Amino acid sequence: MGKKLELKAEKSERIVAFLARKVPGLSGAKANILVRNGEVRINGKRKKTNEVIDAGDSVNVFIPDELQVELPKVKTVYDDENIVVFDKPKRTAYDALPQLYDAPLYSVHRLDTNTTGLIVFAKTEYVQRALAEAFKQRRVQKLYRAVVYPAPEKSEGTLTAYTKLLSDKNLALVSPDSRDGYKTMVTEYKVVERIGGAAVLDVYPHTGRTHQIRAHMSFFGCPIIGEHKYGIKDITPPDGAPDSQMLAAVKLSFSGMKGGLAYLNGMTFETTDNFDLDFLRK
């Protein structure tokens, strides 16, 4: 029977890249086949070439059964009338997760494609606005687990720097000093374990900047193992290190929620990082 999807573009990008990012389990090669076969309509018009779409464009796609799209396994950690909490696997775009659910979901915060762990979606636009404000006011506390190399000298610390996002390159610039157009970012860390010259960290972002933990730890001189965008070229990772970043959102806690979401106060959701550290123990 196949599957019909109605999607909305949030930025300018080519159709194939958009589909591969938004449709769970759909590779770029299979997305290209859909385009060539005329299975994609942009704003109601059939497209057979890999054109650029713009923010706000309506994208309708039909995926026939023969393409055999393999959906990623996504664990639902919590589900009620207002929110759903997923444990996102690696290499799955956060904004593709709503396609796996049987009702509309609204994004509240981001989780990078190669970062695993907990992410919250709202079930109504009202809840989306309330949760977005709660995240902004730090009423939702996030804890990340990361493996960095080399290990920081101090066992704990709070780092402060300034960052500016280059939207066209999806790249966060970092400066030690305040500059025009830069925003403050604050990241707290605590060493959980030192092993093989590396360290397992608990990381608490006190601000919510794009790529904050990845960019900030690298700027601090302790890049995340397997992280390539902000990794330091002069630092060679340990032998056997994985090629994907060792960063996971492992804990979400709610406090100070108001109105119809006050019942979330005191709730905490947790997951494991699933890091394989054997390469550090050799």
Model-assigned labels for residue ranges:
Residues 101-132, 165-220, 247-282:
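The conserved catalytic core of RNA pseudouridine synthases
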Residues 69-71, 129-131, 170-175, 231-239:
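A short, acidic/glycine-rich surface segment
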Residues 43-49, 197-200, 238:
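Short alpha-helix capping/helix-loop boundary micro-motifs
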Residues 1-169, 183, 274-280:
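RNA pseudouridine synthases
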Residues 76, 148, 188-191, 224:
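Conserved hydrophobic positions within beta-strands
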Residues 48-52, 202, 244:
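Short, surface-exposed secondary-structure edge patches
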Residues 1-33, 206, 214-282:
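Pseudouridine synthases involved in rRNA/tRNA modification
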